[in-house]
Regions:
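Conserved beta-strand scaffold positions in the cores of enzyme catalytic domains, especially
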Residues: 3, 29, 104-106
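Glycine-rich phosphate-binding P-loop
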Residues: 5-21
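Fold-independent oxyanion-binding glycine-rich loops
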Residues: 8-9, 91-92, 138
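ATP-dependent small-molecule kinase phosphotransfer cores
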Residues: 33-86, 93, 126
């Protein structure tokens, strides 16, 4: 196996797991770099690429296929890395972008709510009640 993609819920330490896995295996670890590469190569602001993944297409985008074009830019940047093999990807939509590639191990990390609350408290310096409220509202 030469490609691992890791998806995660918020505050489940997916980045940490991905980086340690890549280090242990001697693989390249990639994430947001893909968006930056696509943004630079196709001269598209990074925020537009992020919105293409998160938001519903606008009326204009439905007619111009803007969303599909942006998604294909991101996929191209990711596939350029995957072709080299020995990659751990932990960025946006990895399971989607690598859907029909047979030599990909797809991992989903889910942390229990108690661990997520602790991590939110640690990172954001919040009370446990406020952290729990924020996590439940996502």
């Amino acid at each position: 196996m030469s490609v691992i993609t890791i998806s995660r819920g918020s505050y489940s330490r997916g980045k940490e797991v991905a980086e340690k896995t890549a280090l242990k295996l001697g693989y390249e670890c990639i994430s947001r770099d893909i968006l930056l590469e696509a943004s630079e190569e196709f001269n598209i602001p990074e925020i537009r690429l992020i919105r293409a993944l998160h938001d519903s297409p606008s009326v204009l985008e439905r007619f111009t296929h803007g969303r599909e074009r942006y998604v294909s830019y991101i996929r191209k940047a990711l596939l350029q890395h995957v072709q080299k093999d020995n990659v751990v990807y932990h960025g946006l939509a990895g399971h989607y972008f690598l859907l029909n590639i047979p030599h990909v191990l797809k991992v989903r990390i889910i942390a229990d709510m108690e661990e997520r609350v602790k991590e939110e408290v640690r990172r954001e310096n919040l009370s446990e009640e406020k952290a729990l409220y924020i996590l439940k509202s996502r």
